[in-house]
């Protein structure tokens, strides 16, 4: 068969196979067009489950007479005009395929009038080439779309349609989802001439619960916990049912929206499921109605034919944000009091202060600073936590919105610098700027060695070895334990009986190293780790650490810190000059003994005199 261009009707029918799955798909596409047109009222009339008639009538802005023919053409849309528009979609539709696809598998009539026009116009496409005919009609401002005899010309598709009741139930579910997305729009759904659903527009926030109860039912409303959580350009609002009282009927309520677009996104569902994991049974599912607002540039909606899924550019960031938002409201509901007497106030981590990250027995202690209040969040869920507000995929700022008064006081105590003066440490003699320095970094050799010049000599320093010694110094506790950094997503691991026994024996020592965990019958949950481990792959490192502990008969913090320092992955596969200079500055400050007596494998002198003499003799 030779290559040939498909007829327009056949091409549209192929496209309809992706967009128009059943009558509910038609209703979704047409109602979304009405919402994009600014409609505040949409009437949906269905006959015989949508197989005979689907009529969508709205009071939107309407379509001009000159654009009616284009409205039924493929790839014709008013939503986007350039790639920049596509990368920042705010409308529900944008491809310009829905009307052309629907008209190719049904008898579609489009009637519309704008406020500027004195009369309405009606358009319909017919024939092999889908020629559009336009004629005058009577109609108020807005648009009406009638879809008759869906799949009349594609018997194979019509054969796969279900019963009238089943198809209408799918349409009813679509309208429920849209009603939850747009509280400001009145939606009326009729079937076979009988009004089945009427969702009146609500203007005030206090009335949203009324529509929520009408759609999701009173049991969900009674167990619903309100969420309002924000950080940067991300906002999460909505409701999640208390997992402790979730029933089988409630588990069917799982509605999530991204920028007002209804979604069935696996990433969002996984984040919510993980937040409720400790409170749900093995066969239970969370119930929720959640709305995620995100910068349109950070999400790609053009990845699914029916736009049921999206792709986030920073998926880990979004996952952790949703997880933390849901987890916070569930923790608030438990009303558990944090034991003040058992938790010492933790100083706020300042990235520039390397001493706060580990011990320093050699440098002069800094002057005590005045206590600082934590930064005021924009929302109740916007406070940044112990990781210095680093917005990385592995560590979202730890924040708890809407905490009760007692819990809020405890949380603020954990964030702020203690007002009491620290216990003075023995003051060491001031360091000699020349004797306690590795020298000047000249260049990077081989990607992981620094060429140093000091006092007329040239030396080669191994940066990974220096980094390992720095890690060990940061991990070894001094007079106080190493600062523990709470994990946004606790790491839950299955352990054997021997491994569990070893962890329990070493629990106090691990606590001094900043590693906090909880254990149950067969699992251990890592809750916090020291700062040097925040960017590590803990799913690999922690099981290896547990295996190491299980092989030991005695435990010491120095040995554990040394093992961790030797097994953490370097953050710099290829070192730069700036990274090398920063590392050496930290090593000179935290480990000055390495400058006085470098251990093996750290420094290697370069004999320039022999090289110079060899050149002179040539």
Swiss-Prot record:
GO terms for cellular component: mismatch repair complex. CDD domains: HATPase_MutL-MLH-PMS-like, MutL_Trans_MutL. The keyword S-adenosyl-L-methionine does not apply. The keyword DNA repair applies. One of its GO terms (biological process) is mismatch repair. Residues 382-392 have a biased composition (Gly residues). Gene3D superfamilies: 3.30.230.10, Histidine kinase-like ATPase, C-terminal domain (3.30.565.10), MutL, C-terminal domain, dimerisation subdomain (3.30.1540.20), MutL, C-terminal domain, regulatory subdomain (3.30.1370.100). InterPro entries: DNA_mismatch_repair_CS (IPR014762), DNA_mismatch_repair_MutL (IPR020667), DNA_mismatch_S5_2-like (IPR013507), HATPase_C_sf (IPR036890), MutL/Mlh/PMS (IPR002099), MutL/Mlh/Pms-like (IPR038973), MutL_C (IPR014790), MutL_C_dimsub (IPR042120). Residues 367-402 are annotated as: Disordered. GO terms for molecular function: ATP binding; ATP hydrolysis activity; ATP-dependent DNA damage sensor activity; mismatched DNA binding. Residues 367-378 have a biased composition (Low complexity). Keywords: DNA damage, DNA repair. Pfam families: DNA_mis_repair, HATPase_c_3, MutL_C. Belongs to the DNA mismatch repair MutL/HexB family. This protein is involved in the repair of mismatches in DNA. It is required for dam-dependent methyl-directed DNA mismatch repair. May act as a 'molecular matchmaker', a protein that promotes the formation of a stable complex between two or more DNA-binding proteins in an ATP-dependent manner without itself being part of a final effector complex. This is DNA mismatch repair protein MutL. It comes from Salmonella paratyphi C (strain RKS4594).
